[in-house]
């Protein structure tokens, strides 16, 4: 994934030093796009190890509509715990907006599947996780926001759109805020996996995954890790094999996915900015 290393280098070379909500500080650019041909391998970063269970379980959790971390914790995925209440609640985050937008029964995922099957040339085949009604206040804690009925965090990956050409399904993600070192490799893998799943459900081949970022930043406490990653040579991409076709997009299980020949450099640890 040379494209991803080019992205990191571009931020380092062209970014502006900025403060941020977390107080950590960043080097930031505005606007960047990467394209991945899903026919040429699954875009899983190889210059460090990506924790595949976190990618898969989080996506299945989103698709379930859940906003409580219990399922994640039961599967040893703790990436959301910092923002959850003592009861594990995160408020109306991704899963709620995808499956029951604004609490009004609008299942955006089901609607996308139906449109892809019945109106594949539509330019309205998209899902929005951004709901201004529940965007949290930056003046209070995530847990206090949840108590007020808001999300613990606003969605970083805010909207994604689908497009069919030559019987191939492509997906474009718009990410308003992009943690280049920790978050973006994860997001690329997650939405590429979702594209494969929806393509299977709609009897389509996969096309491209296009990642579009708004505020793309490297946190100041990730610079050393980014330099280490840039020193590494990318390896061949793995391939994804889906072992069965469930009856719906909501019925996949972790065991349905096999990432074949995932060769990678060692993991690089870094602190998340809360």
UniProtKB/Swiss-Prot annotation:
GO CC terms, sorted: cytosol
Enzyme class: transferase
Cell compartment(s), UniProt: Cytoplasm
Pfam families noted in UniProt: Thymidylat_synt (PF00303)
Pathway recorded for this protein: Pyrimidine metabolism; dTTP biosynthesis
TM stretches of this protein: none
Reactions catalysed according to its record: dUMP + (6R)-5,10-methylene-5,6,7,8-tetrahydrofolate = 7,8-dihydrofolate + dTMP
Ranges in coiled-coil conformation: none
GO BP annotations, alphabetical order: dTMP biosynthetic process; dTTP biosynthetic process; methylation
Cysteine pairs bridged by disulfides in the record: none
Residues of the active site: 156
InterPro entries to which the protein is assigned, alphabetical: Thymidate_synth/dCMP_Mease, Thymidate_synth/dCMP_Mease_dom, Thymidate_synth/dCMP_Mease_sf, Thymidylate_synthase
E.C. no: 2.1.1.45
Record keyword Ion transport present: no
Recorded superkingdom: Bacteria
SUPFAM superfamilies for the chain: Thymidylate synthase/dCMP hydroxymethylase
Subunit (UniProt): Homodimer.
Function according to Swiss-Prot or TrEMBL: Catalyzes the reductive methylation of 2'-deoxyuridine-5'-monophosphate (dUMP) to 2'-deoxythymidine-5'-monophosphate (dTMP) while utilizing 5,10-methylenetetrahydrofolate (mTHF) as the methyl donor and reductant in the reaction, yielding dihydrofolate (DHF) as a by-product. This enzymatic reaction provides an intracellular de novo source of dTMP, an essential precursor for DNA biosynthesis.
NCBIfam families: PRK01827.1-3, PRK01827.1-5, thym_sym
Protein name, per record: Thymidylate synthase
Species per Swiss-Prot/TrEMBL record: Francisella philomiragia subsp. philomiragia (strain ATCC 25017 / CCUG 19701 / FSC 153 / O#319-036)
């Amino acid at each position: 994934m040379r494209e991803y290393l080019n992205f990191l280098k571009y931020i380092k070379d062209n970014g502006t030093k900025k403060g941020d909500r977390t107080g950590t500080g960043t080097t930031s650019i505005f606007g960047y796009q990467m394209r991945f041909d899903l026919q040429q391998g699954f875009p899983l970063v190889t210059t460090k190890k990506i924790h595949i269970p976190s990618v898969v379980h989080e996506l299945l959790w989103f698709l379930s509509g859940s906003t409580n971390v219990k399922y994640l914790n039961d599967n040893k995925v703790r990436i959301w715990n910092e923002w959850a209440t003592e009861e594990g609640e995160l408020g109306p985050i991704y899963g709620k907006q995808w499956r029951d937008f604004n609490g009004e029964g609008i299942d955006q995922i089901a609607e996308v599947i139906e449109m892809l099957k019945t109106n594949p040339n539509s330019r309205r085949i998209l899902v929005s996780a951004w709901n201004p009604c529940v965007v949290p206040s930056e003046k209070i804690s995530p847990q206090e926001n949840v108590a007020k009925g808001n999300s613990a965090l606003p969605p970083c990956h805010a909207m994604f759109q689908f497009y069919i050409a030559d019987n191939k399904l492509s997906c474009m993600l718009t990410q308003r805020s992009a943690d280049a070192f920790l978050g973006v490799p994860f997001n690329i893998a997650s939405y590429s996996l979702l594209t494969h799943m929806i393509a299977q459900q709609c009897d389509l081949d996969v096309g491209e995954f296009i990642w579009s970022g708004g505020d793309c930043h490297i946190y100041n406490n990730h610079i050393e890790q980014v330099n280490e990653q840039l020193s590494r040579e990318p390896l061949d991409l793995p391939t994804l094999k889906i072992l069965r076709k469930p009856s719906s997009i909501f019925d996949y299980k972790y065991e349905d996915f096999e990432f074949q020949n995932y060769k990678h450099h060692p993991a690089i640890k870094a602190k998340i900015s809360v």
